[in-house]
Amino acid sequence: MAISASAGAAPVITIDGPTASGKGTIAHRVAKQLGWDVLDSGALYRLTALAALRRGLPATDEPAVAAVAQALDVRFDGPHVYLEGRDAGHEIRQEEVGNYASRIAAYPGVRQALLERQRAFRQPPGLVADGRDMGTVVFPDASLKIFLVADVEARAQRRCKQLIEKGISANLDDLLRDMRERDARDTQRAVAPLAPAADAHVLDSSGLTIEQTVQAVLDFWRA
């Protein structure tokens, strides 16, 4: 283990990284191996984006979007996620929602509104949390911090394959352009920019299978 969690707190493994780096899949599989809970923090930002889009709010209206985040009515039930009582698992994976979420994630009001919601997922026996600032902001005392990286072309191909398998139309060139723009926004924003924590293990998954990446994380945990 990298460090000890705060006294009395459930242990946390954080897995941060850029969009489509595989962090969600890896987090779920590591959590399953350990018998822990999992937090997909990106889903909370996407749910906020979807709720704002349903209300016709432009992504530039920071106060209104922050108010939506503050009052967000969501429920997680296993693999299902509900927004205002309706299953939103398919909708939040649409690229329009993802791009909107990337823009509003830069707003301090939105990040603050979702901070305590994310920390509330920390329960025994442990939590695997994936996102962009899990190890730097949300769980700075995490027992193990992983920062996943992968070549942007590989990530775009991975996302394209995921969308097509879910029956969602996707264009590789469009995805690659959007991904580069989102990477720039995530790394350059003033609040909680995407960057590895000083004590994070940087893991390049470009040439690794999902199973190999999961094993690498488990090896770090058990070391």
Curated annotation (Swiss-Prot):
Highest taxon above the source species: Bacteria
Reaction equation(s) it catalyzes: CMP + ATP = CDP + ADP; dCMP + ATP = dCDP + ADP
A GO cellular component annotation in the UniProt record: cytosol
EC numbers: 2.7.4.25
Pfam families: Cytidylate_kin
Subcellular location: Cytoplasm
GO MF, any single term: CMP kinase activity
Keyword Kinase: yes
UniProt-listed SUPFAM superfamilies: P-loop containing nucleoside triphosphate hydrolases
GO biological process: nucleobase-containing small molecule interconversion; pyrimidine nucleotide metabolic process
Keywords: ATP-binding, Cytoplasm, Kinase, Nucleotide-binding, Transferase
Residues reported in the UniProt entry to bind ATP: G17, P18, T19, A20, S21, G22, K23, G24, T25
Similarity comment text for this entry: Belongs to the cytidylate kinase family. Type 1 subfamily.
NCBIfam families found in the cross-reference section: cmk
The name this protein goes by in its record: Cytidylate kinase
Species, as recorded: Bordetella bronchiseptica (strain ATCC BAA-588 / NCTC 13252 / RB50)
